[in-house]
């Protein structure tokens, strides 16, 4: 079990993570919709993850969402790197009712984000612009190359949840053990 903590003047975060788990989640960030997305991610990535966060949500949820992305990325970095004997690449298209989102990832040890989800406004009290902030923090702290591409959909909740689940399935596929892969790069290092 990997454990990473981070404490700033804005947030206090602890993440415990087992990369090859059973999809068990214990999430408490103080942001209900975000907790729901992280639970979906954990379940479909087949990782076990505990996240606790105390943040300055009396201001807004920005610091909590972004900083949790940082710490989850750092925990996954500890669990995955150096990359050896895994697939490295993963992709998935996930649908949720009318919504469809495609995710492509490369455990390249290079942070990069392509975020093409046409969402704005709120889901309940949650500012959906924070979704991109989470994925950026996640991608650059893991680090990995992450593309999230909108295919269709109208319901913001469904689009966002499809994105989190697509990332989960892509990650599960990328970290699948392949003893023949060695270091999956022509460079000999990632």
Curated annotation (Swiss-Prot):
Annotated source species: Sulfurovum sp. (strain NBC37-1)
Reactions the enzyme catalyzes: D-erythro-1-(imidazol-4-yl)glycerol 3-phosphate = 3-(imidazol-4-yl)-2-oxopropyl phosphate + H2O
Gene, per the UniProt record: hisB
CDD domains recorded: IGPD
Keyword entries, A-Z: Amino-acid biosynthesis, Cytoplasm, Histidine biosynthesis, Lyase
Family as reported in the entry's similarity comment: Belongs to the imidazoleglycerol-phosphate dehydratase family.
Protein name according to UniProt: Imidazoleglycerol-phosphate dehydratase
A Pfam family it matches: IGPD
Top-level taxon in the UniProt lineage: Bacteria
GO molecular function (one): imidazoleglycerol-phosphate dehydratase activity
Transmembrane feature ranges: none
Pathways involved: Amino-acid biosynthesis; L-histidine biosynthesis; L-histidine from 5-phospho-alpha-D-ribose 1-diphosphate: step 6/9
InterPro entries in UniProt: IGPD_sf, ImidazoleglycerolP_deHydtase, ImidazoleglycerP_deHydtase_CS, Ribosomal_Su5_D2-typ_SF
